[in-house]
Amino acid sequence: SALGGENRSESNLRVFSAELRQIAIDSGATPEQADAMVEKVCEGTPRIDEDTMPGELANVVSGRVANLLDLQGPNYSTDAACASSMAALLDACRLLQTRQVDTMLAGATDRCMEAPTYAKFSAIGALSPSHSTPFDARANGFVMGEGAGVLLLKRLSDAMADGDDVKAVIRGVGGSSDGRGKGITAPSQRGQVQAVSRAYSQAEYAPSSVELVEAHGTSTKVGDATELSTLSLLWTG
């Protein structure tokens, strides 16, 4: 997801520079003082040009990849918060299964590490002031990081026929929504159970046959408790 990152809010300062100047004058500043204030406020902010608008569109990231690699299949960005990369994977697998495409790139990137982001996550008790300790009594939130990852996906039969170096096989992918719950950001055991159950049903695996599970691990009291109860219900019934 692009959305302009931190440059979006900074470029908006230039959009409102005329209003800032007028407010300063209305508050008693001279035109010269108002001009100096606006210049100082806008100093270092990106100028608005032909790349500003495209840079604020969420789809531009995938669009640039398609443009660079001359890819001619569907390209779009998915936004499902922490599950965005999984949502991209879900769509990619569906397109491959219905044979609308033969190869898909699915991935995600996150690099918006700035003060407002820290403040907002702290306000909901999700950002740890010290360190991340998921599923631990000391858990007090997670530590944010930056990174990116992308998968090249093909139907297994095609990959084997092409002699590709197959790293892993996706047997099933599942998704769900929490529906109505305690709050818009509150996790739901019902939704989690549905998503995981659908994935295992498609894979034709029983949850009890799986020996390694990668958890979300938000390191928050509510998030960890909900996820553990979900896994316990699936694995022990």
What are these regions (language model features)?
Residues 1-237:
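Condensing-enzyme catalytic core of the thiolase-fold
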